[in-house]
Amino acid sequence: MNNIRKTHPLMKIVNSSFIDLPAPSNISSWWNFGSLLGICLVAQILTGLFLAMHYTSDTMTAFSSVTHICRDVNYGWLIRYLHANGASMFFICLFLHVGRGLYYGSYMYLETWNIGVLLLFAVMATAFMGYVLPWGQMSFWGATVITNLLSAIPYIGTNLVEWIWGGFSVDKATLTRFFAFHFILPFIVAALAGVHLLFLHETGSNNPSGLNSDTDKIPFHPYYTIKDILGALIMITALSSLVLFSPDLLGDPDNYIPANPLNTPPHIKPEWYFLFAYAILRSIPNKLGGVLALVLSIAILAIIPLLHTAKQRSMMFRPLSQCLFWILVADLFTLTWIGGQPVEHPFVVIGQLASVIYFMLILLIMPTTSMIENQLLKW
């Protein structure tokens, strides 16, 4: 009798993706983040669904409905904080996943990489719109400031902003449409993640050495299923600790003040996972220039494969590139810190320096260093 796992039309797709999938024998824990992101996405969709059952997307009642969820709904506080901190966990996993791709040269799988960049943009858009929904001070002013950036687009800018707002300011129409988009986007993200996996399975996984691993493959199950479960348990433990011990650690206290268009908060800033891009935006005095730098800070990932000048795929055997990679990581931490600081001396100068270093490293220094390493191989 044939194994149903290998013959059933649906089961054989699952089988070839998660059970009998040939995987390199040497992939490290840095390869766990794909599955962790999948878990995050499912958790966000489920908690979001339950929140949407009690939330009202009206400027008069949005803030109250979130309060109602936390106070009156059974385990509403838990669902709300799992959703809010789940987003932080999602971005931690995303950044580590992208960092892994950069370090080990996974960007050489062009289709997989480009869909990944698209996914990053989609998740960032989803998170931004989700942050607006509780309708606190930071929700309102964050939405106002970020959507206003589009007015820097020549000729159509002002019309575009008013079209997105659905009026002449961020108001009821804006909140309602942001709720609609925030609800639908995660399902688009899930579909894109499916395509991301589809392209990955066309080529198979990369591995730490960056070498072809066709000669040494092992089945995904049980080896990597058990490894992924361990990673998931660690992540769930971290998320649970955050939610149950300090749920507001990563949030902004200003968001516990209902939105007031007549009162601007002293420091308008987005959630921590956008601070690096926000710092790059603020480091350029020109509005349009800042917006372009903001978009390019993420979009630059799409041209990383074109900047690969090394003869080796992975950085595993390239110590100079490794040093530069960790300088880039330190630079991103610096930008994140600066993004949360007020616009005053010395933070402005530090932000400008960190922004220049960020683009210089990616566009010039790292490709040049790779070429130097190619020459060193001959010695």
Curated annotation (Swiss-Prot):
It is found in: Mitochondrion inner membrane. One of its GO terms (molecular function) is metal ion binding. Keywords: Electron transport, Heme, Iron, Membrane, Metal-binding, Mitochondrion, Mitochondrion inner membrane, Respiratory chain, Transmembrane, Transmembrane helix, Transport, Ubiquinone. Heme 1 (or BL or b562) is low-potential and absorbs at about 562 nm, and heme 2 (or BH or b566) is high-potential and absorbs at about 566 nm. A ubiquinone binds at residue 201. This is Cytochrome b. Binds 2 heme b groups non-covalently. The lineage of its organism: Eukaryota, Metazoa, Chordata, Craniata, Vertebrata. The chain crosses the membrane at residues 33-53, 77-98, 113-133, 178-198, 226-246, 288-308, 320-340, 347-367. Its main location: mitochondrion. It holds the Pfam family Cytochrome_B. It comes from Crocidura rapax kurodai (Kuroda's shrew). It is a multi-pass membrane protein. Belongs to the cytochrome b family. Component of the ubiquinol-cytochrome c reductase complex (complex III or cytochrome b-c1 complex) that is part of the mitochondrial respiratory chain. The b-c1 complex mediates electron transfer from ubiquinol to cytochrome c. Contributes to the generation of a proton gradient across the mitochondrial membrane that is then used for ATP synthesis. Heme b b562 binds at residues 83, 182. Its cofactor is heme b. GO terms for cellular component: mitochondrial inner membrane; respiratory chain complex III. The keyword Transmembrane applies. The gene is MT-CYB.
